[in-house]
């Protein structure tokens, strides 16, 4: 519409200068239907003016986009002011309509009425106040119909009790959001992401629908959420966007993960309580509500694919795994070593339940490690470590051996250090089969266990395992032999004890004590001492030579001579008699 120009209307020469004629564009209704009622201020009216003017305007009214003519010479100052106000209000309405169309809020839906631009009437100016009163109800109607833009209520037919319950739940959602925004890590998510300021040029390519807690609070305050599900969806979308754009391990990812768990811990109990009250209020037969709860859970879990892929997410997913494990038989969770014997025991599992029931209790008394695996502790890393430690070792003929874990490598390195020196030759042969580049510094070889290939690592593991088995077997056989062999020559031992008692009753001044030389020769090996090219051999049964005489109190006695002759008293020559270690120990005790 072409706006009319109003300037210096109160000047006396204004009407003569401008010709007192203004035009405006015609809209959708005839503006000349009440032209006859306008008062004529021309003292010399033209009798043909009314007929020709009306006929011309009637011709214009048949065309859209024509112009309506206003003869400003026939209006007083007050009427011109009213006309100016009228044009100003129409212009304001057109601008508002244009802004709504450009912003996209102008939609035509069922139950929504597009506000029509009020028709411009050339009625008597004294009726302008009546037209203003007509505009009032239309504006109220417009505001009332705008509510049709909201999403439909998913909680069935509206009634006062249901609306009151829903309002209470939305109030609880508002309280949960306030607590969440006051968290010490929530400052990252309270405002929209500053893509330009942070230089995140690919943010909108990765995140298709940005969301933040501040926007969620604004939408909640304006009443855009008609159900708690929509509110929870936007809150979860905020944290999902952060975990989608930021890789795992960064601070933002960790903060979003913890805040999402914190939100679920507050929202899920409140929503379950709301569902129970809703079902109690309406009844299961009044509306198809049973499909709502699984739909909500499906939306809740399908909306967070990273949480299922990255074991990110923690506590709720592990609890679901617990429920599945408790429902299913515990046989699939056992390691392969335990599953295979059970298959051998039951080659043909019969279908009747009485036969299946005895099979279920068999895996129930497993070692304690199996109980930890079934219980699934909250820390996902601990579960993964426990499962990795229970992996079976590959066989030697297996072409595709699994990679050795870090725990197994460290254990292998400790076992290699405990090998005796006689096994190092075989160890070097195994290493040089596939690793000829090992650097050798004299007798030492530097071995980096991380640089050794997987095949060699498993061969070294088998070598160490076989050695440990052999060593434990030898030790076990020696222990059994010592326990099963009875003590030999019990009589000689008794005689030795009696002889020792008799010698102690004798002269206590003698330093050398004869304890009886009845100990069997086979119990102690011969001792050879090389000195000055001469070898002196003394049997373990020989006693100490003292004062040139060798006597035996218990029977046969023999004194070992040195290579040159008999023993003489008080001689300190190299050919002195050699005492057995057993005799020396007894002398030291005395």
Curated annotation (Swiss-Prot):
Compositional bias segments (type: Pro residues): 347-369
- Low complexity bias (residue ranges): 537-562
PROSITE patterns referenced in this protein's UniProt entry, alphabetically:
BROMODOMAIN_2, NET
Annotated Bromo domain ranges read 164-270
Per UniProt, the keywords (alphabetical) are: Bromodomain, Nucleus, Transcription, Transcription regulation
What residue spans carry the Acidic residues bias annotation? 509-521
Q: Does the keyword Transcription apply?
A: yes
- Give the GO terms filed under biological process for this record: DNA-mediated transformation
- Report the Pfam families cross-referenced here: BET, Bromodomain
Q: Which CDD domains match?
A: Bromo_plant1
Organism's domain of life?
A: Eukaryota
Q: What is the first-listed, main subcellular location in coarse terms?
A: nucleus
GO cellular component annotations of the record: nucleus
Show where the NET domain sits: 394-475
Annotated spans, Disordered: 125-160, 282-400, 476-590
Instruction: Please state where this protein is localized.
Output: Nucleus
> Compositional bias of type Basic and acidic residues: which residue ranges?
288-298, 498-508
Protein name per UniProt: Transcription factor GTE7
> Which gene does this sequence derive from?
GTE7
